[in-house]
């Protein structure tokens, strides 16, 4: 909590994501019908937001060298603390806001127990105008930050040892692959349970903003100070597992998305 630089970095990052949502061009799509029959509109520009951020990071590394981008690695505790506080404050805000006006409440977060409802999420789609807080946090601040944290870990390893291990390269590339895939398929999250059924409370807030980026990057963080050399056989074996797993993951998710949209006539309950 005393790492002022870490806090400043995190909130500067979060504000970038918010500003990018408003100013970066993106198409608008409709979500699934709500219980009321209404369909909400969502702005799809997470991929462009991520591309700008990653492009900026790579430009810094190219111009100033890897040592210039170890800042995220060095200020990891401060970044994590700021993310936790941000997630708690957002959970408090959306819970309080759910009592004002006619809000559509989540069936599972309207128990009457304030602690439970705050944790699970009372309002289904908390918004400020057309800015949807839940879908925004789902893909942007945490997911893209995960990629930046991984890259910072690679830079730390290179700065400390003068070389980069094959293991950390694979971990980082696979993580970024998953992240970019998620950003490309941003509209598919609109059919997922997190968006259609769950309210937005502390559970999703801390999961999206703190748990996801700061635990998912731990493999790269460990390898940053403990390099492991796999060799060509190890690399090829891991690549085979990765490609197989990704194929299953993507095909299964696309099939689920098509079924939820009613576009898969072969699908059955």
Stretches with model-predicted labels:
Residues 1-269:
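Membrane-anchoring alpha-helices and their flanking helix-loop junctions
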């Amino acid at each position: 909590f005393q790492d002022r630089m870490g806090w400043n970095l995190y909130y500067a990052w979060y504000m970038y994501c918010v500003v990018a949502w408003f100013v970066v061009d993106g198409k608008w799509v409709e979500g699934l019908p709500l219980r009321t029959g209404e369909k909400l509109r969502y702005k799809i520009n997470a991929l462009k937001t991520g591309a700008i951020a990653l492009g900026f990071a790579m430009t810094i590394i190219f111009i100033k060298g890897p040592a210039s981008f170890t800042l995220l690695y060095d200020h990891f505790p401060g970044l994590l603390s700021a993310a936790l506080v941000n997630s708690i404050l957002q959970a408090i805000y959306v819970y309080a806001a759910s009592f004002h006006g006619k809000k559509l409440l989540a069936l599972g977060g309207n128990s009457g127990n304030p602690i439970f409802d705050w944790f699970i999420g009372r309002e289904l789609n908390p918004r400020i105008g057309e800015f949807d807080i839940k879908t925004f946090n789902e893909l942007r601040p945490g997911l893209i930050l995960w990629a930046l944290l991984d890259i910072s870990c690679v830079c730390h390893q290179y700065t400390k040892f003068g070389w980069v291990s094959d293991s950390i390269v694979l971990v980082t590339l696979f993580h970024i692959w998953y992240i970019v895939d998620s950003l490309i398929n941003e509209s598919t999250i609109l059919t997922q349970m997190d968006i259609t059924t769950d309210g937005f409370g502390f559970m999703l807030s801390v999961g999206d903003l703190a748990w996801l980026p700061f635990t998912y990057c731990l493999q790269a963080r460990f390898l940053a100070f403990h390099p492991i050399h796999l060799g060509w056989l190890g690399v090829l074996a891991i690549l085979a597992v990765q490609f197989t797993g990704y194929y299953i993951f993507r095909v299964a998710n696309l099939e689920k998305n098509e079924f939820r949209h009613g576009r898969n006539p072969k699908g059955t309950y």
